[in-house]
Amino acid sequence: MTETQSLELAKALISRPSVTPDDRDCQKLLVERLYKIGFAAEELHFGDTKNIWLRRGTKVPVVCFAGHTDVVPTGPVEKWDSPPFEPTERDGRLYGRGAADMKTSIACFVTACERFVAEHPDHQGSIALLITSDEEGDALDGTTKVVDVLKARGELIDYCIVGEPTAVDKLGDMIKNGRRGSLSGNLTVKGKQGHIAYPHLAINPVHTFAPALLELTQEVWDEGNKYFPPTSFQISNINGGTGATNVIPGELNVKFNFRFSTESTEAGLKQRVHAILDKHGVQYDLQWSCSGQPFLTQAGKLTDVARAAIAETCGIEAELSTTGGTSDGRFIKAIAKELIELGPSNATIHQINENVRLNDIPKLSAVYEGILARLLAGNAV
């Protein structure tokens, strides 16, 4: 494919050092492009976060692309082979922070819209974009706030494509049609500090927690299902003691996380953890944080359309998967009937020398255009 508009727009976005939540006028650039083809733009800013809701049309179905203009910090700049905010073509790849996650996806959807509208100026339904500068950070003032606004006025989405990088080995090989929930615990096991030579005068929280830890790590939380792997429990941090070799610690801090399927619930997991701790007589304080519930789009029209567009452009059959971390899809699903995630390779996201394959860029734009054509122009699946 010789289409170069997507590459040029991706470069323009990457050149803006939009480290979360600083948008650096990325959204302004998108508005300038989309205004020319009939999109109305609504700024929905909260605190330091910039959000934009763009829409062309007033009818249904509404096909929405969701993305984020913010990027994670670069890490040590000297370790990059080229400056992270100077998009560089090298060895058949485009390098730069945000190349994969997710400025290329945004660029590809914008150019797909430009071509689609040129060919179908009176298309069915509406096209929308929900863009935030707060996905890589706390994600408190970004997509979730925009969803609240849209929900309050009854503005719903029929089909949503989140441009997260999803490809594993080649473009189009994987579509995310759901995500696991994420539930974290911050556990403080209480003991009594003392001299290590006099254990009878102390209570060692490491020892009292050990049997419960064994049971927690061996527990089968659920078996998963057709779309989700079994729920996983992982310890991320354990810390206790003063650093001295002759002091029994007074407290033990344990941080853990569940990635849970639709076979489990937040309340159910909490209850089971408390039951195990209580069973072993652990004295503790436990604080919980749930950053996202599991969600799923059953195989249906949107997944079929996306697979057809991928097959047409990439010549492969896409796999449906719910693996990986959380995304803003967890917020959007509250107002979206069907939602998928589809973007470039995730092999280098958040890494030094983040990149995408140059020949994947026009293909991804063509895939997005193919989805629009099938949903809003009556093209056969």
Curated annotation (Swiss-Prot):
Its cofactor is Zn(2+); Co(2+). Pathway: Amino-acid biosynthesis; L-lysine biosynthesis via DAP pathway; LL-2,6-diaminopimelate from (S)-tetrahydrodipicolinate (succinylase route): step 3/3. Keywords: Amino-acid biosynthesis, Cobalt, Diaminopimelate biosynthesis, Hydrolase, Lysine biosynthesis, Metal-binding, Zinc. One of its GO terms (molecular function) is succinyl-diaminopimelate desuccinylase activity. Its EC number is 3.5.1.18. Pfam families: M20_dimer, Peptidase_M20. InterPro entries: Bact_exopeptidase_dim_dom, DapE_proteobac, Peptidase_M20, Peptidase_M20_dimer, Peptidase_M20A. It catalyses: N-succinyl-(2S,6S)-2,6-diaminopimelate + H2O = (2S,6S)-2,6-diaminopimelate + succinate. The active site is at D70, E135. GO terms for biological process: diaminopimelate biosynthetic process; L-arginine biosynthetic process; lysine biosynthetic process via diaminopimelate. Zn(2+) 1 binds at H68, D101, E164. The keyword Metal-binding applies. Belongs to the peptidase M20A family. DapE subfamily. HAMAP family: DapE. Homodimer. Catalyzes the hydrolysis of N-succinyl-L,L-diaminopimelic acid (SDAP), forming succinate and LL-2,6-diaminopimelate (DAP), an intermediate involved in the bacterial biosynthesis of lysine and meso-diaminopimelic acid, an essential component of bacterial cell walls. PANTHER family: ACETYLORNITHINE DEACETYLASE, N-ACETYL-L-CITRULLINE DEACETYLASE. This is Succinyl-diaminopimelate desuccinylase. The gene is dapE.
